[in-house]
Structures are given as C-alpha cells and as structure tokens.
Regions:
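Conserved PLP-binding catalytic core of the aspartate aminotransferase-like
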Residues: 79-80, 84-121
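Short, small-residue-biased leader/transition segments that mark boundaries at the very start
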Residues: 2-6
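Short acidic/glycine-enriched loop/turn segments that link adjacent beta-strands
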Residues: 27, 101-102, 132-134
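PLP-dependent aminotransferase class I/II
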Residues: 12-91, 95-96
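PLP-dependent enzyme catalytic core of the Aspartate aminotransferase-like
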Residues: 119-120, 129-158
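Short beta-strand-to-loop capping motifs
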Residues: 35, 107-110, 142-144
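Conserved beta-strand termini and adjacent loop/short-helix elements that scaffold enzyme active sites
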Residues: 16-18, 100, 127
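Glycine-enriched alpha-helix->loop->beta-strand junction motifs that scaffold or abut catalytic
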Residues: 10-13, 121-122
Length: 158
C-alpha cells in the first residue's frame, strides 16, 4: 500500500524489491519493479534478457507467496520485538543507536569493532565507507534470538 502511494505521488520513481532478504533466499535472483511511467516501463522491459528468471527462482517465488501475508506479518512482528530489545540493550551499553524502519540497527561504536567482531565469529557491517560517515559507524541485522543474544553478550564483554 505504501509503495502504491509513492508511485501515485511520484510517477517517475521506480520501486525495486527483491525476495532475497524478506523470504530468506540468498543466491536466488528474484524480484520485481513497480513503475507508474509507461514509457519508462517499456524501456525497462526492452533491456530484459529473454530468460531473465530461472525456473528455480520462479518455483521459489511461487512457494514464498503461498500464505505470504501471514508470514510477512509474523516476520514484521518478530523484527519489531527483537529490534526494540536489541536497541535497548545497546543503549544501556552506551552505544549511540539510530532509529529506522529497516530490519537492521545502525549505531556508533568504537573504532575497530568490525575486526574484533570478525575474530569472535560475528559479522557486523562497517559503514565507515558510506559517504558522510566516519570510522566507528556500524550496522547489524536482526537475526534469531540466540544470535541476537550472542551479539549483545559479546558487546557487554568489550
């Protein structure tokens, strides 16, 4: 619904979505584009390869869409709950955490945190190469409760 509103208000905006993250399909190249501008849609279609989606990706996409409303609702509720908990825990540790609508948490921590996490078997995104950001800016994804607790426990020990 939100995407439809954006399309109506901004006809030259193209919204691109992938199944990869929300449906946990790493490596499966499947997604879609929403575009109100007919001329732009025609140009985009002209650039597509004749067989641009594999049979495997098509089957995975169809399977993902079965009961997807219930799945998406559960997923959003889980992410909201875990993100709230993690944000609170990180703030208690003195980390500067920014709010977002995404399934990840953006925060400012000590320089070198990425390397320390890697040595401990944890993966966080070093955002220091993003334009306008400096060393010490990181991003973490909301994962399983066990993985989230492991990350918080690790941060507490630093």
């Amino acid at each position: 619904q939100r995407q439809m509103c954006i399309r109506d208000r901004y006809p030259n905006v193209v919204i691109i979505k992938a199944f990869t993250k929300i449906f946990c399909m790493p490596g499966v190249r499947l997604g879609y584009a929403l575009c109100e501008n007919a001329a732009l849609r025609k140009r985009m279609r002209a650039m597509l390869q004749p067989w641009n989606v594999s049979v495997t990706a098509q089957e995975a996409g169809v399977a993902a869409l079965v009961d997807c409303e219930a799945y998406l609702k559960r997923t959003r509720e889980y992410i909201k709950k875990e993100k709230f908990w993690m944000t609170e825990q990180m703030r208690k540790l003195g980390l500067n955490v920014w709010g977002s609508e995404a399934n990840y948490i953006f925060f400012k921590g000590k320089a070198g945190l990425y390397e320390k996490a890697l040595k401990s078997g944890l993966l966080i995104r070093d955002c220091s190469n993003y334009e306008g950001l400096t060393e010490g800016h990181y991003r973490i994804a909301i994962r399983s409760e066990e993985e989230n607790e492991r990350l918080i426990t690790w941060l507490e020990k630093l």
